[in-house]
């Protein structure tokens, strides 16, 4: 049921599925960096929701990994591709101690907690809506509220659990729309007028444009307050001071990755792109940069509001929890305190060496391909 919310890029099938593991670094002593004199390395196993790591989405992890920020913080970061067949893998692996930090969608996180899994969000990557609606370029729809009574194309019927809460938030009865399950060509169905709208997301828009699809969009962050995919950990670990410190340091590295990206987006895109050989076969550098910029802007949602990177918005979560309960997606009406905490987020933002990241970014030398790329005018994060 929640498989589609977990692997929103499943239809693109870039890279190998399954629990393939990629790690860099080895056991070492962190030395004097970041005040961790003599500290031994500790491993954090992060699991993707997609069944692949061959996407630009995780630039905020590749940058601190490749720039040595995790290493300086005493962390060996292991990135796990995850499972494309197990919808709850990104929470289940964490609950079973096969991973330490997952990246579940709100639907997967709440379903997992509702079923008794002891996991909790410590970082909302976007702190707002990642999903959008794509429209034909000649569509007369100008507001998402006009989707009432319209047809919406989906890549899978399971995506209904993504769209239903979005419609309810807009005051639309999900029963009033007609879902069109069109497989991997769902956005082609929109472009050719076979559906009034289609589910899209940040990072996908640039890829669709690169494929020659002409569409316009109702951008979710402009009208939705619902949360997006989060970094979640075992709830019990949050009662362990050593684990809290470990995850906070990991998030400090994430903050540095984001600050680096803000200072030099092309460098962040180059680092990420060059780390992903399979992705290089399907995306050219400019398109990879464009895809990353869409996501990077969204990742900066709470930062632009002065709340720091990765803030879990209580109001947005509260509304979402009520909506999914009313829709029957959770049996219990979950309390926000059982779903997320911002305690680690606050400390990570305060302690991260943002100045070092910005300095490194400005000094980073671009290769020939990325030196020719352009950052779109007005980009912010």
What are these regions (language model features)?
Residues 178-181, 188-197, 208-217, 226, ...:
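A residue-level marker of the well-folded mature domains of exported/periplasmic proteins
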Residues 16-17, 99, 195, 252-259:
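Solvent-exposed alpha-helix faces
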Residues 241-332:
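Secondary-structure end/capping motifs
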Residues 132-134, 230-233:
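Short glycine- and hydrophobic/aromatic-rich loop-to-beta-strand nucleating segment
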């Amino acid at each position: 049921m929640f498989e589609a919310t977990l692997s929103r890029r499943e239809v693109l099938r870039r890279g190998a599925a399954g629990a393939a593991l990629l790690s860099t670094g080895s056991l070492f002593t962190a030395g004097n960096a970041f005040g961790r004199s003599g500290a031994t390395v500790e491993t954090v196993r992060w699991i993707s929701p997609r069944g692949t790591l061959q996407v630009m989405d995780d630039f905020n992890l590749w940058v601190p990994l490749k720039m040595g920020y995790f290493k300086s913080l005493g962390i060996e970061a292991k990135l796990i591709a995850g499972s494309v067949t197990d919808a709850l893998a990104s929470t289940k692996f964490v609950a079973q101690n096969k991973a330490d930090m997952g990246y579940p969608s709100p639907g997967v996180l709440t379903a997992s907690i509702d079923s008794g899994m002891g996991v909790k969000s410590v970082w909302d990557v976007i702190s707002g809506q990642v999903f959008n609606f794509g429209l034909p370029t000649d569509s007369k729809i100008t507001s998402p509220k006009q989707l009432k009574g319209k047809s919406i194309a989906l890549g899978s019927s399971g995506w209904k659990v993504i769209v239903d809460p979005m419609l309810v938030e807009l005051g639309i009865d999900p029963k009033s729309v007609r879902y069109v399950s069109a497989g991997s060509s769902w956005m082609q169905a929109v472009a050719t007028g076979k559906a009034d709208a289609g589910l899209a997301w940040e990072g996908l828009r640039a890829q669709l444009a690169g494929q020659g699809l002409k569409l316009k969009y109702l951008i979710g962050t402009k009208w939705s307050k619902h949360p997006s995919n989060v970094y979640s950990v075992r709830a019990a670990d949050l009662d362990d001071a050593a684990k809290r410190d470990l995850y906070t340091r990991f998030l400090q590295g994430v903050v540095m990755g984001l600050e680096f990206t803000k200072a030099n987006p092309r460098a962040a895109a180059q680092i990420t792109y060059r780390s992903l050989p399979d992705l290089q076969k399907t995306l050219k550098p400019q398109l990879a940069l464009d895809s990353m910029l869409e996501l990077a802007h969204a990742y900066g949602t709470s930062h632009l509001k002065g709340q720091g990177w990765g803030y879990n918005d209580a109001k947005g979560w509260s509304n979402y929890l009520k909506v999914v309960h009313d829709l029957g997606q959770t049996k219990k009406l979950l309390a926000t305190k059982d779903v997320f905490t911002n305690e680690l987020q606050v400390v990570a933002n305060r302690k991260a060496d943002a100045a070092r990241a910005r300095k490194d970014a400005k000094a980073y030398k671009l290769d020939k391909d990325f030196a020719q790329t352009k950052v779109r005018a007005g980009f912010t994060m």
